[in-house]
Amino acid sequence: MTRAKTAFEDALARTAAAVETMLDGLLGRESLAGELERPVRLLEAMRYAVLGGGKRLRPFLLIETARLFGAEGIGAVRAGAAFEMVHGYSLVHDDLPAMDDDDLRRGRPTVHRAYDQATAILVGDALLTLAFDVMADPATDVSA
C-alpha cells in the first residue's frame, strides 16, 4: 500500500467518523427535544437509514472542498452530515417497491423491509426536511 493511499484512507476514515458522530447527534432524542414530538419509530427508522454504513465519500468531498476555501470546522461537518441525509433520503425512496423494490441495502434489510412502506416514505421525507433544517441553521455557517 502506498503512503498516499494510506493517507487518503486515514483522512476518509476520520471524516467518516466525524460525520457519523454528527449524524448520531443530529438524530438523537436529546437534539430533537425542542422539536415537535417525533414518533419513536420514525426516529429509529431515520437512524437505521443513515447510521452504521457507507464510506461517507460525499461528505468527505464536501468537507475537503470547504477546507480548500478555508471553511473548516464544525459547520463543514454539519453540512457533510446534511449531505448524507439527502443521500439517505434518495436511497430510502429508491428502494421502495414503486421504484427498485430492493430488499437489501449495505447488507441489511432496506427501510421498507425492516419497517414498512409508509414508514420508509416518511423517513425519506423527514431526512430531506431535516437536511434543509441543518443547512439553514446558523451553526452550519462556515463563514463565521
Model-based region annotation:
Residues 24, 36-144:
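Mg2+-dependent prenyl diphosphate-binding active-site environment of isoprenoid biosynthetic enzymes
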